[in-house]
């Protein structure tokens, strides 16, 4: 949908008082970047990330092709396994890729920090259903904080799963990261109870068990 429609929408609660995951926040962040840099989001993505990360087959798509629609930032990335693993490598290595500094280490740390803080977290969020985790610091900036070090409060496993079967994750404690893609036909929640979204963490657990 156009940004003008988004900005006319009313907030449903005071910012910072409650956590509720949703792609609208990503749309607003994308528009903020456009205004600050005076460039369209796709141009920013290509110049700042895709090109230096050699993601030659990656771009963002709008919700539909009718015209007048902004890129869909929460789920609208068209990419490949090989392209996306370059991005994960950069995040895993604290902002560097092939010796090039893409993001500052401080930026990556802030992305993975607890952004929920004292906000109310309602039952049934992703980490609770998928991992049985009931901690409140479940989300950073565009990343789920799946597994937390109880002593430091730092997330040692982060992810950004998609409803249609994409599961990228990084586990810093086990020194492993990966990207699993599955083609899911129809709704992600099947009649037999399987959900490609909530079932994703079994992949990271299996990989960690193998590398150990």
Task: Give each language-model segment a name.
Residues 120-124, 148, 187-212:
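Short, gly/Ser/Thr-rich active-site loops of penicillin-recognizing serine hydrolases
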Residues 98-103:
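Surface-exposed patches in mature extracellular/periplasmic domains of secreted proteins
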Residues 57-82, 113-179:
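Active-site Gly/Thr loop motif
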Residues 180-187:
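C-terminal soluble interaction/assembly domains
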Residues 31, 35, 47, 86-90, ...:
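Residue-level signal for well-ordered alpha-helical scaffold segments within enzymatic catalytic domains
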Residues 90-94, 114:
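Generic structural signal for alpha-helix termini and adjacent loop/cap motifs
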Residues 4-81, 85:
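Catalytic-site signature segments of enzymes, centered on catalytic residues
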């Amino acid at each position: 949908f156009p940004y003008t429609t988004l900005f006319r929408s009313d907030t449903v609660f005071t910012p910072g008082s409650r956590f509720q995951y949703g792609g609208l926040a990503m749309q607003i962040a994308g528009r903020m970047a456009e205004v600050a840099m005076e460039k369209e989001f796709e141009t920013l993505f290509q110049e700042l990330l895709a090109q230096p990360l050699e993601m030659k087959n990656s771009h963002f798509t709008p919700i539909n092709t009718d015209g007048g629609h902004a890129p869909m930032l929460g789920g609208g990335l068209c990419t490949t396994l090989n392209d996306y693993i370059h991005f994960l490598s950069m995040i895993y290595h604290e902002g560097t890729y092939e010796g090039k500094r893409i993001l500052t280490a401080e930026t990556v740390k802030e992305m993975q920090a607890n952004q929920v803080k004292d906000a109310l977290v309602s039952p049934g969020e992703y980490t609770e259903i998928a991992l049985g985790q009931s901690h409140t610091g479940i989300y950073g900036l565009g990343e789920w904080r799946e597994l937390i070090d109880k002593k430091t409060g730092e997330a040692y496993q982060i992810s950004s799963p998609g409803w249609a079967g994409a599961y990228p994750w990084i586990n810093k404690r086990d020194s492993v990261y990966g990207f699993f893609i599955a083609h899911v036909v129809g709704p992600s929640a099947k009649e037999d109870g399987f959900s490609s979204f909530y079932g994703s963490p079994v992949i990271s657990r299996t990989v960690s068990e193998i590398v150990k």
